[in-house]
């Protein structure tokens, strides 16, 4: 285990609440807490068993004044998250109380932790690997149950296990090649022929491709579908956002141009996280503020994963509607014909023709009709029910996806070398590159600056 100084931070969100926690980790964690803690029985934290919790007060050692009433948990190395001694001081929530406790802890020998430093220590001390550490932040940021389950899988080491198995296969192959080259006289070692080498390389490539086949869905679960709502002014775009978000997030009026900017909201649609973006109605306008909103709407379209195009059932199609269809040509989209509670004036056959095979859903958002059908269309368009398979290991992290793609390329370079009749000792260069790239996923072969960058994304106290 690596030796570090003792760190401390508030590990609960700031603000009013029932309980706040100050966490300490390091060799001096128990000693520092012991200087500040007084129990009614006079017991000392240094003498208590590991994984126990104790009632008492935090005392300012200089003045002897009672600062807080607390419950203190003591957990001794190595059976802790960081594999160091860990103390958690549970005090009352709020801003003043928890900060008083933290300042006393820092004044008595602890250092304020950097973002993600507790998890970083868990990684550096061998408690978790890098992909498991990254899953911690995914778990915290998960917007749906499914996204949380994917993060939990990664935290449990399912991806790590597969990566280690692939690296072991490559390593055994490399070792076999080395023995053949360095000790050709060993008759009891099977010769690594091009055919045998190809079998090993094709197996690794197949497993990498299997992982990459989950990447599109995994990335959606991790980051959410960037879903842009577009349509002419006053067709019900903001009503759609409110209906999917199940709250009044956007202003809804009968005045065209009410939404003058881009409104974003995360929503959960049947387990699929949507980063729902309500745009200003796209139309020609003289209003400077509204025109800026329209320009931003057009920019958002270029970055969207899904377009929800809203039309008015009670009005004929306009040139603006047809122009919107042209703008989203070739994109994943669902056409929503809203206000079906009113008499039909829209040409539905023309709508279906313009939709070009993409789903068309009728809604009356005023009366909350058609929302279930819309949610089903969204889930079916991207997942088609396949997400329920619990035995899949999803790859959701962009860094992991990029490294898997690079490793696959290295394996394919090795296969091309075999086909070209290159010597086995040259082919192994590409295999070793694949082994190193896979190692970067779990942190076995990764630069320290990248580790610092990854953990800097965490919140304080985690």
Swiss-Prot record:
It is found in: Cytoplasm. Binds 1 potassium ion per subunit. (6S)-5-formyl-5,6,7,8-tetrahydrofolate binds at residues 23, 88, 127, 462. It comes from the Bacteria. Its main location: cytoplasm. GO terms for cellular component: cytosol. Mg(2+) binds at residues 238, 259. The keyword NADP does not apply. GTP binds at residues 234-239, 253-259, 278-281. Residues 224-383 form the TrmE-type G domain. GO terms for biological process: tRNA methylation; tRNA wobble uridine modification. Signal peptide: none annotated. Keywords: Cytoplasm, GTP-binding, Hydrolase, Magnesium, Metal-binding, Nucleotide-binding, Potassium, tRNA processing. NCBIfam families: mnmE_trmE_thdF, PRK05291.1-3, small_GTP. PANTHER family: TRNA MODIFICATION GTPASE GTPBP3, TRNA MODIFICATION GTPASE GTPBP3, MITOCHONDRIAL. Homodimer. Heterotetramer of two MnmE and two MnmG subunits. Belongs to the TRAFAC class TrmE-Era-EngA-EngB-Septin-like GTPase superfamily. TrmE GTPase family. Exhibits a very high intrinsic GTPase hydrolysis rate. Involved in the addition of a carboxymethylaminomethyl (cmnm) group at the wobble position (U34) of certain tRNAs, forming tRNA-cmnm(5)s(2)U34. This is tRNA modification GTPase MnmE. It comes from Geobacillus kaustophilus (strain HTA426). The gene is mnmE.
